Amino acid sequence: MRMFLFLLLVQFVSTASASRTDSILTILDSELGKKMEYRMEKEKQISTLKQSLFVASSVYEQYFICDKLYNEYSSYQFDSAYVYAQKSIEKAELLKNDELMESAKSNLLFCFISAGLFKDAIDVMQEINTSRMSIRQKQIFYDQMSRLYSELARENMKEPYHRKYVNLCQAYCDSALLILPEGSYEYNNVLALKTYTNPDIPSEKKIAFYERITDP
């Protein structure tokens, strides 16, 4: 979480005091030090899941293993995450299960956002029916949409497009915050994005907010 929030607010570090900058960079160094250990553990889990997928007999079981593989890859290897998101869609089609299909589409949406394929992401978004989603799936979807519009706002600085995308980002953040447990990992991530993308909040306050929610 700290790594994510650091990257979200890093452009404001130059406006902070030297002590604040040192504090934030110390957190980043700590997170980078854990990267190799984290990746090795991920690869071990992925290998086990692939073996399970190879021997899985039911389509339901195959779907959920593909979904788990997507989740394992989604944090660091987006092309592989895309492969298993697509496989999940194929399994959901065979099962004719609307809720599983919406979840798989949401996974595909994440892959397109992560790859910067925003047009493809919008196309997938327009196919998603949130009325078929569980609360948990809606939490994930609203979070993804807030990030999509955050990226579009960053890519389109000209008005009226920039303000339009900022407003949509803020609106999806609000939707996510309404159904996320307050103070949770996901809640703080969305709140950080809402704070970061709000043009009315000075950079000093954004950095102070970052320090507050990452304080152990």
Question: Predicted segment positions?
Answer:
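A "functional boundary" signal
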Residues: 14-216
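Sec-dependent N-terminal signal peptides
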Residues: 3-12
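Short, Lys/Arg-enriched, disordered terminal segments
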Residues: 1-4, 19
